[in-house]
Amino acid sequence: MTNVFFMETQFDFLAVQVIVFVQPPAPLDGAALREALGAVHATPVARRILALGRVGDEWLPNGFDLIGQRGGAYGERIAAVLADAHATATLPMLLIRPDAAGITPDMLEDAARSLISGEADAAFGPASDGGFWLLGLRRPDRSLVVGIPGPDEGGAPGRLLLDRLASAGFRVALAPRLDIAGTPALRG
């Protein structure tokens, strides 16, 4: 099957794809998911993708493509999703966690513009749980994400990823730190 993309030239259209990465089998806060999907939907991008742990009869919001996750560990699944998205559309990518509270279209646009303009090679948004809520790349690079632990696996996956980006010589655009639904900052 061939994907055909028609892109109208518009000043306010961002030639980037946004991937919403849903971590299975973790329970997901419905309000955070709706907020994240709403922010992605309101951002003028070329492609919106929902990356799920298993592909079946999931509810798929209008305007989103569906990509299944493959691979075992968290970092392997991220690498595979980025590669699969890039294989069908060679556009820069923003991968987001939908459990981050406060994602806005402006945040996504800022990250996308930094990649498109060449100001940055990567975009990174730190998360309150020590992970990250945003990873933006101009092209996939397995070495950056394979071995990164999941947010529920302990350690400091955000710091590890940021260190890898720096070691690779990437210029990194930093997004604001966001709280993660279910962490103490949002519980109470």
Predicted regions and their residues:
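Short, polar loop motifs at secondary-structure junctions
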Residues: 51-57
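N-terminal nucleotide-binding beta1-loop-alpha1 segment
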Residues: 1-26
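Short phosphate-binding loop-to-helix
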Residues: 60-93, 153-154
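A short, N-terminal amphipathic alpha-helix
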Residues: 29-47
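Active-site acidic Asp-centered loop
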Residues: 96-98
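Conserved alpha/beta core of the MobA/IspD/sugar-nucleotide pyrophosphorylase nucleotidyltransferase superfamily
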Residues: 5-6, 160-188
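Conserved donor-nucleotide/metal-binding helix-loop-beta segment in metal-dependent transferases, i.e.
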Residues: 102-129
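Short, glycine-/small-residue-rich phosphate/pyrophosphate-handling segment
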Residues: 122, 139-165
